[in-house]
Amino acid sequence: MQSRLSWIFNPKTGKTVMLAFDHGYFQGPTTGLERIDINIAPLFEHADVLMCTRGILRSVVPPATNKPGVLRASGANSILAELSNEAVALSMDDAVRLNSCAVAAQVYIGSEYEHQSIKNIIQLVDAGMKVGMPTMAVTGVGKDMVRDQRYFSLATRIAAEMGAQIIKTYYVEKGFERIVAGCPVPIVIAGGKKLPERETLEMCWQAIDQGASGVDMGRNIFQSDHPVAMMKAVQAVVHHNETADRAYELYLSEKQ
C-alpha cells in the first residue's frame, strides 16, 4: 500500500500532479479527448500520475510511458441518464495486472444512489487491502447539491471513514482549509469546468496553500490552448511553491 502511495506523491514534496482523462467513461469523446493519442499523449511526460480507464490504458497509452496510473473503477452510467447510478467497473485482479498505483470511484453523498456509491467504495477498499491497492474516492456532486464547505466536509469525511486512502474533491473559496482539516487522508483537487489559465493557477495555489496534497486536473489542462505550458505552470505551483502570478508568467513564456 505505502509503496503504491509513494508512486503517487512525490517523496520530496509530498504532493502530486495527476492528469485526468477518464471523462470518456460517461461523456464519450468530449472536447479535447477525441484523439487521446494525439491530444493527450504529449502531456504524459509532464504529469506525475495518469488517471484513465483500463480501456484507454490498454489501447492508447504506450507501455514505455512508464507513468503511474490511477484506474477509473466505477462506471455503468452515462450523461444520458442519472450520473450517480454507478457500479464497480473494474476487478482488483485487473488493476494489479495493469500495475496501477490506485483505483478511483465516485461517491455521491446526498444523491439518489448515495448508498450504492458508498458500497462501491467499501467494496474497492476491501479488495484493495488484500493486494495493497489504494482507493481514491472522488466526490461527485448531485444536480441539486450546493458546492460549499459543509457539503464537501461531509462527503470527504464519509469517504475517508469508509477507508479511502485518497480523496479527490473540489476547491471552494470559503472554508477549504476546514475541509482539509476534517479529512484524515490526503486531498487532491479536481479542476472542474474549463477556466481561464490565470484563474486555474490561482485555484491551484489557494488549494495547496490551504493544505491540499495536489491536483488531479483534466479539462483545465487539455482544453487549454497550450496544454504543455499549462502542465508546467501547474507543476510549478504544486511542487515549487510558485505563486499564481509567477506560474502564469511561466505559462506565458512556455507557450511561445
UniProtKB/Swiss-Prot annotation:
Keywords: Cytoplasm, Schiff base, Transferase. It comes from the Bacteria. This is 3-hydroxy-5-phosphonooxypentane-2,4-dione thiolase. NCBIfam families: PRK08227.1. CDD domains: DhnA. It is found in: Cytoplasm. InterPro entries: Aldolase_TIM, DeoC/FbaB/LacD_aldolase, DeoC/FbaB_aldolase, FbaB-like. It catalyses: dihydroxyacetone phosphate + acetyl-CoA = 3-hydroxy-2,4-dioxopentyl phosphate + CoA. The active site is at 168 (schiff-base intermediate with substrate). One of its GO terms (molecular function) is transferase activity. Involved in the degradation of phospho-AI-2, thereby terminating induction of the lsr operon and closing the AI-2 signaling cycle. Catalyzes the transfer of an acetyl moiety from 3-hydroxy-5-phosphonooxypentane-2,4-dione to CoA to form glycerone phosphate and acetyl-CoA. It is an enzyme of class 2 (transferase). The gene is lsrF. Its EC number is 2.3.1.245. Gene3D superfamilies: Aldolase class I. Homodecamer. GO terms for cellular component: cytoplasm.
